[in-house]
UniProtKB/Swiss-Prot annotation:
Name this protein carries in UniProt: Potassium-transporting ATPase potassium-binding subunit
Similarity annotation: Belongs to the KdpA family.
Protein's membrane topology: Multi-pass membrane protein
MF terms in GO: P-type potassium transmembrane transporter activity; potassium ion binding
Function text: Part of the high-affinity ATP-driven potassium transport (or Kdp) system, which catalyzes the hydrolysis of ATP coupled with the electrogenic transport of potassium into the cytoplasm. This subunit binds the periplasmic potassium ions and delivers the ions to the membrane domain of KdpB through an intramembrane tunnel.
GO cellular component terms listed in the entry, alphabetical order: plasma membrane
Lineage: Bacteria, Pseudomonadati, Pseudomonadota, Betaproteobacteria, Neisseriales
Keywords: Cell inner membrane, Cell membrane, Ion transport, Membrane, Potassium, Potassium transport, Transmembrane, Transmembrane helix, Transport
Subunit and partners: The system is composed of three essential subunits: KdpA, KdpB and KdpC.
Subcellular location as annotated: Cell inner membrane
Top-rank taxon, per record: Bacteria
UniProt keyword Transport present: yes
Transmembrane annotation, as ranges: 11-31, 67-87, 136-156, 179-199, 255-275, 286-306, 333-353, 363-383, 385-405, 422-442, 489-509, 532-552
Species of the source: Laribacter hongkongensis (strain HLHK9)
Length: 567
């Protein structure tokens, strides 16, 4: 990498950690209940809202009740969002007069936004009414992110608590995450984006006069900034416009691009700091942050180096410049900012894009795909990134214990066969959905019909789609025509089970750990707060990804790269 890439990446990480550290302390105080005790008015607001919901604020839940509450809450979200999309043509705040969506597309979109995936098989500005955007999609952007936070806090409590098996109150955790974290942050970020030029209005569109042809043109508009903020802070990723954050109404300036990149990683990084404070050892959080940072920097280096090369097909035509691969990228961002954004959005389960990933060089696109396939644990989604990395931490401790004869133990909790079964299920769900879904798609006529490109690149488009859906990312290789009944239903299944078939084992693990005593460290305990454990954790993540996905990646991005550079 050149000096500019190193400087920009280093500055980004420094600013991110500077913001995440105090936010992590705030999160620990908030979700442990210390803020509500200190500020009585916060407690009164929480109790009032929970009373309206019919929930008891002081009631502790076991993992089964906690999981049932999370599942029912999100299932209700799917039903309501599905109906809102189907009936939007009859509802107000629809100045463009848009009709309701088809049943399969509405189901796909409802599952997509409820699961924090935000996969979009439609063009937002020509499909969704303002009411659907605000009351449906934006609301689920908050609630899906709050769900991830609630689940990871429950898991952290499992490590902290001793005996009893209670892991908290799901309704209170959801409320606190939404009301005292996501909403205030979104207001601040939305105001910054409006200052930079992101639109925020209730118009059907803006009519302008063209300077060149002297004709009028209607530019789609709406409440973009408010949705853009939570789309990024909640690692949701679904854009108001089809071009997502490449659209100048969503991301007009290099500074707004910088703010958007910071917003994606801010809460995931802060949650890791929160974890260290809640378990009483900040070093444990620092180790996870270090492992995430190592994986992120390595991935960015691969993407940037790949995109710094000109496309050999354009070079042969004499059409390639000296700025690298600019196909599918906005000139106002260039190769460096586009590569950094692409790495961030696929490392987190965000999926927002400021460049077209289908136009990335094969190795660049392959790396963004691999980041998703690793389980979105490199900072990852809000909540899901941390609980995913904690699963790998437990796995790393268990493997180390088997190799050196030490008792598998993490944060004072013994790791036995029941815990490892739950960890294994949670880790293997994603690969099963990705590989099985891709296989079904390429073996059926309906699946192959959506592939716009033949050969390795067409296979990569399908593999990317299922990797994105099953790992709740939402970005796409847009050459795949995915708004069909086949892909809408297949990807909806991948998104739902990719989210909740992981959440349920994670909550079961939390309940199992919470019922165990927390033991003091002994000479036989593997230290999990030093550089050695960082290396072990990174290798565990890469080992699972390599063993699982290398054959599929070889058939897609690797062959695509070899074919491109052998011409």
């Amino acid at each position: 990498m050149n000096h500019s890439a190193v400087a920009q990446t280093g500055l980004y990480l420094l600013v991110l950690l500077a913001l995440a550290w105090p936010l992590g302390r705030y999160l620990a105080a908030l979700l442990e209940g210390r803020l509500a005790q200190r500020f009585a008015w916060m407690g009164r607001i929480e109790r009032g809202i929970l009373w309206l919901m019919g929930a008891a604020p002081d009631e502790e839940m076991g993992w089964k009740r906690y999981a049932a509450a999370i599942l029912l809450f999100n299932l209700a979200g799917v039903v309501l969002l599905f109906l809102l999309q189907r009936w939007q043509g009859m509802l107000p705040l629809n100045p463009a007069g848009l009709e309701g969506m088809s049943a399969d597309s509405a189901l796909n979109t409802a599952v997509s936004f409820v699961t924090n995936t935000n996969w979009q098989g439609y063009s937002g500005e020509t499909t969704m009414s303002l009411l659907t955007q605000m009351l449906g999609l934006a609301v689920q952007n908050f609630l899906s992110a709050a769900t991830g936070i609630a689940v990871v806090v429950a898991l952290v409590r499992g490590f902290v608590r001793s005996g009893g098996g209670a892991i908290g109150n799901a309704w209170l955790d959801l409320l606190r995450a939404t009301l005292w974290l996501l909403l205030p942050l979104s207001i601040v970020v939305a105001l910054v984006l409006v200052w930079q030029g992101v639109v925020q209005n209730w118009y059907a569109g803006l009519t302008i006069s063209s300077l060149e042809s002297h004709t009028t043109q209607l530019l789609a508009s709406g409440p973009v900034a408010s949705q853009e903020a939570i789309k990024l802070l909640g690692t949701n990723g679904g854009g108001f416009f089809n071009a997502n954050s490449a659209h100048p109404f969503e991301n007009p300036t290099p500074f707004s691009n910088w703010v958007e990149m910071l917003s994606i990683f801010l809460v995931p990084a802060a949650l890791v700091v929160m974890f260290g404070r809640m378990v009483g050892d900040l070093r444990q959080g620092v180790v996870l942050l270090a492992a995430m940072t190592v994986l992120f920097v390595g991935a960015f280096a691969v993407v940037y180096l790949a995109e710094s090369q000109a496309n050999p097909l354009l070079t042969a035509l004499g059409a390639a410049g000296d700025s690298g691969n600019l196909e599918g990228k906005e000139v106002r961002f260039g190769v460096l900012a586009s590569s950094l954004f692409a790495t961030i959005t696929t490392a987190a389960s965000c999926g927002a894009v400021n460049a077209m990933h289908d136009s990335l060089m094969p190795l660049g696109g392959g790396m963004t795909m691999l980041l998703m396939q690793l389980g979105e644990v490199v900072f990852g989604g809000v909540g899901s990134g941390l609980y995913g990395m904690l699963l790998f931490a437990v796995l790393a401790v268990f493997m180390a214990g088997l190799m050196i004869g030490r008792t598998p133990e993490y944060l004072g909790k013994k790791i036995g066969a029941p815990e490892m079964k739950l960890v294994s299920v949670a880790i293997l769900v994603g690969p099963l959905l990705v590989l099985a879904g891709t296989a079904i798609a390429v073996l059926t006529e309906a699946g192959r019909a959506g592939m716009a490109n033949p050969g390795a690149h067409g296979f990569s488009e399908v593999l990317y789609a299922f990797s994105s859906a099953a790992n709740n990312n939402g970005s796409a290789f847009a050459g795949l025509s995915a708004n069909t009944p086949f892909y809408n239903l297949m990807l909806a299944v991948a998104m739902w089970f990719g989210r909740f078939a992981v959440i349920v084992p994670v909550l079961a693990l939390a309940g199992s750990l919470a019922g165990k005593p927390r033991l003091a460290a002994t000479a036989g305990t593997l230290p999990t707060h030093g550089p050695l454990f960082v290396v072990l954790l990174v290798l565990s993540v890469l080992l699972i990804g390599a063993l699982t996905y290398i054959p599929a990646l070889a058939l897609g991005p690797v062959i695509d790269h070899l074919q491109l550079f052998s011409r």
